[in-house]
């Protein structure tokens, strides 16, 4: 099977990538079941890439039902060593406005219905996730943002809620004012933890789509 290096995990609304040469969709089986979709492989600007839509084409997987273990295992099995994960998020800060990006450097995991580790059923290991992202890959993402002239924030803490419902106003204020989180979403956990267990370099780019409900303009 063709070996690739850079994995791109697409979030809500991102089901394909442009500019890929010699692209084709491939099926990958894993011990954890099927991934969210087939994986699109090819070459982008001379780099071997593998693209996986996190929710599947047509957005068929809820955040709770995304097969996170199968996704990471499938990417690992075809040679991916680095993942750039894209996700839509809500802002918990006045200065992180809709249309801007955040290079996430920390997470708070509030999920409770998802399989979060590869190490169970007789295979036990304890992996540090104190620094859950790859700073080298994050720096490369920042350089690309600079080159493209995009408005972005160099770092931020992403709180992952279970979903599919959004947070209550009390929860939103808790995350913002007590826990000092910056953005909120539903999908980067346990994805980042699993990538660390699989020894894959992981970077997260959060795309701010709106203010969370702490903000008076959250519905606008």
Task: State where each predicted segment sits.
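Active-site glycine- and acidic-residue-rich loops that bind
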Residues: 130-135, 165-166, 177-187
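Generic non-transmembrane alpha-helical segments
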Residues: 136, 140-151
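Short acidic/polar active-site loop segments enriched in Thr and Asp
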Residues: 81-82, 182, 201
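Non-catalytic positions within long, well-ordered alpha-helices that form the structural scaffold/packing
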Residues: 76-79, 176-177, 196
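Generic hydrophobic/aromatic pocket-lining and core-packing "Φ" positions
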Residues: 72, 172, 189-192
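Active-site phosphate/oxyanion-binding loops
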Residues: 94-124, 151-174, 197-220
């Amino acid at each position: 099977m063709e070996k690739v290096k850079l994995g791109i995990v697409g979030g809500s609304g991102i089901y394909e990538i442009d500019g890929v040469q010699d692209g084709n969709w491939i099926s990958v089986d894993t011990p954890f079941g099927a991934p969210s979709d087939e994986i699109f492989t090819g070459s982008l600007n001379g780099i071997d890439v593998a693209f996986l839509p996190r929710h599947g084409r047509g957005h068929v997987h809820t955040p709770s039902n995304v097969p996170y273990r199968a996704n990471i295992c499938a990417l690992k099995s075809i040679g991916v060593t680095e993942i750039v994960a894209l996700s839509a998020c809500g802002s918990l800060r006045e200065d992180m406005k809709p249309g801007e990006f955040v290079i996430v450097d920390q997470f708070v995991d509030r999920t409770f219905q998802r399989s979060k580790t590869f190490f169970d059923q007789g295979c036990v290991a304890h992996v540090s996730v104190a620094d859950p992202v790859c700073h080298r890959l994050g720096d490369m993402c920042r350089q690309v943002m600079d080159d493209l002239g995009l408005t972005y924030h160099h770092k931020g803490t992403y709180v992952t809620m279970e979903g599919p419902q959004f947070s209550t106003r009390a929860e939103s204020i808790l995350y913002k004012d007590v826990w000092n989180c910056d953005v909120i979403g539903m999908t980067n956990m346990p994805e980042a933890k699993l990538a660390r267990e699989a020894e894959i370099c992981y970077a997260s780019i959060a795309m701010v789509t709106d203010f969370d409900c702490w903000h008076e303009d959250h519905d606008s």
